[in-house]
């Protein structure tokens, strides 16, 4: 895995470059592209159901503001699942054109029609799709510190992964490293990924302390020497979020285990797959 031209392709929130993120359609497109795994984000509804959503609020990727005008600031944790399931989590893509793919002619009217009315998946639905597809997933648990779900979001996530028999095919990551300690305690079989915004003084020591398998840093401030040191110590390095082919080639040469990308087709092309 640490050879110069081999690395895992991770569809970041699904194939979100061309499909609304964190939807089952984004997952389907990522799978069809030939990726090794996909990454999703876990939050929770007010009534205790784990759902797949990146932001703390529903404003950017749903029509919650129009549908529930009095519920500002539209925090996902303040809505019951039944309410979340009424939201359109696909139409926003056409208005925002987040990666300029509509303007570039890469996403056309027919594709945009299929985005209308997409729903926020539950984690159960996402894991079910992954399991049935014989695929792998990186479950990122969003930091819910201060929210009602904080005491149980980790344990419920682990419980669901175990129920699907996916403890050994799922990587669980979080920027909240205490969550990773809780995952390890709840089910030691699950591999852990330590997400970091800022590089710790000693990444290898951090991984050992957490019992983590992989170091998951952002690309912007990452140095080649860090990747090499972590890999030499026997750990994996998954880098987020790498969308330009020149950057893909660069970190591939550094020995990255895998890359999170919004455009997995580009990375697959770089790899010659």
Question: Where are these predicted regions, by residue range?
Answer:
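Phosphate-group recognition and catalysis centered on beta-loop-alpha active-site segments
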Residues: 1-273
């Amino acid at each position: 895995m640490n050879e110069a031209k081999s690395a895992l392709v991770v569809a970041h929130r699904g194939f979100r470059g061309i499909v609304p993120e964190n939807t089952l359609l984004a997952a389907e497109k990522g799978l069809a592209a030939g990726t090794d795994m996909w990454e999703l984000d876990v939050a929770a509804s007010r009534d205790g159901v784990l759902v797949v959503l990146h932001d703390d609020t529903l404003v950017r990727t749903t029509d919650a503001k129009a549908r529930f005008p009095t519920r500002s600031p539209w925090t996902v944790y303040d809505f019951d699942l039944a309410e979340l399931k009424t939201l359109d989590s696909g139409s926003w893509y056409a208005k925002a054109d987040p990666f300029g793919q509509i303007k570039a002619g890469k996403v056309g009217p027919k594709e945009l029609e299929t985005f209308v009315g997409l729903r926020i998946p539950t984690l159960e639905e996402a894991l079910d799709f992954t399991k049935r597809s014989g695929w792998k997933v990186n479950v990122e648990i969003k930091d819910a510190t201060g929210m009602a779900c904080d005491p149980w979001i980790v344990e419920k996530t682990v419980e669901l992964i175990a129920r699907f028999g996916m403890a050994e095919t799922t990587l669980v990551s979080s920027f909240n490293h205490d969550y990773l300690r809780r995952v390890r305690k709840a089910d030691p079989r699950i591999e852990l990924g330590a997400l970091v915004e800022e590089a710790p003084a000693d990444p290898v020591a951090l991984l050992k302390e957490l019992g983590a398998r992989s170091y998951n840093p952002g690309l912007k401030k990452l140095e080649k020497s860090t990747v090499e040191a972590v890999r030499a110590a026997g750990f994996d390095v998954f880098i987020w979020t790498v969308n330009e082919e020149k950057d893909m080639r660069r970190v591939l040469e550094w020995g990255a285990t895998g890359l999170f990308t919004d455009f997995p087709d580009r990375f697959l092309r770089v790899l010659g797959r």
